[in-house]
Amino acid sequence: SLIVEDGVKTIEEKQITLASGKTVPADAVILAIGVAPETGLAKAAGLEIGETGGILVDHNYRTSDKNIYAVGDAIEVFDRMTGKPSRLALAGPALRQARAAADAMYGIPNDNRGVIGSCALRVFGLNAAATGLNERNARKAGIPCDSVYVIPGDKVGIMPGSAPMHFKLVFEVPTGRILGAQAIGRGNVDKRVDVIAAMVSMNGTIRDLKNLELCYSPVFGTARDVVNQAALVAENILYGRFRQVPVTQVRSLVEEQAFIVDVREKGEYEVGHLKGSVNIPLSELRERTDEIPKDRPVYLHCRSSQRSYNALMALQGRGYENVVNISGSFLGICLYEYYNDVAMGREKIVTEYNFA
């Protein structure tokens, strides 16, 4: 079982005790938590320490002692996007820092642009990757931003192993400058996030990403790649072509008894749906448009937001100005709600979760 939001307090002979007081039987414990960087030697040597606790270095990785250079996990770096001091314990940046420091010793100039924190990992058969700023950190840094959450297939649907990829793209408003991305799925999420890392490093915009030509074969991806699709949706949001709300607001909408339309087919709806939602399949929308009010906000969703987008545009074409798409739709809602329901022990807002 997976336990979230409850840290380990003590490890005993036959069990571990969590911060909540709960105990878990255990014959063996693997601590996959990494090692904290050690700066004790630097402090003892009188080197200046930065505000984040890392060794303070200049753009060439020279410390406060002109005869000492420092690189790697123990140093303080700066965030490329915000310009603020940061720490980053990753092998890739450490290797680049080592090369730059060696060059500096020989008088070769270094173009130190800071870090964007590109990273990836695998957890229980799922791959996750991220780069740049997430939405929370962008707002914390005072950068006006927005985001889109898309869930396209990671390759052509008829290919073996095709699976949904959850992809979130963060961009600056109103410039469209790409700030970062996060992705999770069973496929090559690192490939997509690497593309965004390159765009971030070159100050690329969603327009650049929309037109980016990438490798395509049905076994590797789709003709309109995940990142291209995210850029198209982002452009629609940036230019006000439609409105959206994130999955984080759906619980409030359900509790407020908002008018939520599920445009999936009846069979999909019966397997699991938002409590209080109305099922009007996209295939029946023309005949049932009069069931949708114009005097209050209407929130649309499907499985992954593609059909609900089509429904929204059709309704806007019929004069509806009160329709809003739920970004991430039912797959995104279920993942977000399940995690928080387990962590907080709260009542679910769906009849059944659906993760596929």
Predicted regions: what is each one?
Residues 1, 47, 76, 103-110, ...:
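Generic secondary-structure signature for well-ordered alpha-helical cores
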Residues 2-4, 68-70, 145-147, 260, ...:
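Conserved beta-strand scaffold positions in the cores of enzyme catalytic domains, especially
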Residues 4-13:
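A conserved short coil-to-beta-strand element within the FAD-binding core of flavoproteins
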Residues 14-17, 22-100, 195, 199:
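FAD-site-proximal beta/loop scaffold in flavoenzymes
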Residues 74-187, 222, 226-252:
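Mid-to-C-terminal Rossmann-like scaffold of FAD/NAD(P)H-dependent oxidoreductases
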Residues 103, 107, 198, 313-317:
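Short, well-ordered alpha-helices that flank and scaffold nucleotide-derived cofactor binding pockets
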Residues 187-205:
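A short, polar/charged loop-to-alpha-helix boundary motif
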Residues 207-218, 222-249, 253-259, 266-299, ...:
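Rhodanese-like catalytic fold shared by cysteine-dependent sulfurtransferases
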